[in-house]
Amino acid sequence: MLKSLLLASVLAFFGLNAFAQADVDSPYSLFGVGQVRDKSMNVRLRGMGGVSNAMFGGGMINAENPASYAKIDSLAFLFDAGFYFKSSTFSTSNLAEKASNASFDYVSMAFGLTPWWKMALGVQPYSTSGYTMRVNATYPEVGATTTRFRGRGGMNQAFLGNAFKIGKHVAVGANVYYTFGNAQTETTLYFPDSA
């Protein structure tokens, strides 16, 4: 069990580095904390359209329903990891831009501490930001200008959850979240006529 926890910790560390390098290339990520990602951590939950609160099974980690951890066998160790791929096309009446991005998506693990107490932990991206836009304008005072807006980075979210079985068919659970990361924005103004 100790080897499994060590392996999962190492994978989580490398996963955090992969999150920081994710590049979404979406103009929608300009606003707020960026483009908020799907909260469903498990691929089975995403495949069902994000239905997660009702899912309650011992063979998967459902971070959106922490009481579901109580269904995990007390001798089991669950490890789940995923990858993310997205292909997008952005177009206007005369321009089109394609972008494809792949990144490490999430890592989570769950295990039983006692027959009535189960624990889960994991990390996943909360939001991503990646855009580069240029705006050309002409002003009578200075002439032609080009403004470049660029943003990169995002926020990650780690969680630690516990579930307690308090009856044959009743369980309660709660998660604690920690959100961290950075978003870098840059605005550059060029004066092409001033050369």
Predicted features along the sequence, with ranges:
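Sec-dependent N-terminal signal peptides
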Residues: S4-F14
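Subset of outer-membrane beta-barrel
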Residues: Q21-A195
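Sec/Tat signal peptide C-region and signal peptidase I cleavage site
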Residues: F14-A20
